[in-house]
Structure formats: C-alpha cells, structure tokens
Amino acid sequence: VPEEIIMDALQNQHKLDQKSAQNLAHQAQGNYNKALHLLHQDGDDLVFEEWFVVWVRAAFKAKGNAAAIQDLIQWSEQIAQLGREKQKKFLEYCIEFFRQALLLNYQAQQLVYFEPKVEKFKLENFAPFIHGNNINAIFTTLSDALYHIERNGNAKIILTDVSIQLTRLIHKK
C-alpha cells in the first residue's frame, strides 16, 4: 500500500497529526497492519533510544580506555536484567538505528525517519561512523546476539561480547 494511503488512513481514522502519520507510514513500509501495530506499541522507543545512546557513547570511548570498558560491562549487566523479549526488541531497535545512520551517511535522507530525542545526540553526527566497511559486521554481530538470546544464551555474556565488538567496529575505517 502506498505511504500516502496509509498516512491518510492514520490521520482520518486515528486522528494523528501529519508528521506522526508520515513517520508511521514510512516505518510501516507499505504494510497497514504494521502501521497499526507501531501506533499501538508500548512506547519502548524512547527508553531503547536512551540505552542505545549510552551504549554507543561508551563503546566509542572504550577504545584504549579501561574505565569505559567497565561502563560497557555495567551497561551489559543492566540490559541483561531485563526479560528476553525486551532484550530482543532492543536489539531489533539497534539494528534499525544503525540502518538509519547508514542511510543518512549515504545521503538517502528521504528514507530516514528516526529523529533522536536524547539530548546532545544527533543522527547526523553519528552517521559518519556507520559505513560500508563496518555495517555488515555490525548487523551480523547484532543478529547473532539476537539469535543467541532467543536460544536462551547468557545475556550478560552475549551483550558484553557485542559491546566489545561494537567498540572495535565503530572505529573501523
């Protein structure tokens, strides 16, 4: 279904403003049911965004900095205390966040719908660190972590490993 039709339906039937309807229609990728699901989801995105920003900042600082590695380990322990479903949703959110940064880095602004709400974090400043040389490895790392968490792996170990790998990958040229 074209984005315009989904956008109109969301505005007319669910009384959304144009910007919100446009964002949801874009995220739904032509699937009206997905747009409705996104509309009624439980609002984890802001919390996920805050966790993501803390994680990425710690990973960025961790290269050659033992104190920042401790921050990554603490972050991993905090996320590991959540339920598996929430961990999986968070990792899916991270994959999409990295995808949005890559699209922005490759000048595909019309496909970017993320607008970070965390103070002093701009997608435009983050995007240059996500590029063709590291996106596949980042995606594979996050997908593998998602798989292992689904299979009841130890979340603390999995997330610590992903964090250390992210530190290496985010600095890759």
Model features per residue range: what roles?
Residues V1-Y93, L104-Y113, K117-K173:
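Charged, glycine-rich active-site and insertion segments that engage polyanionic ligands
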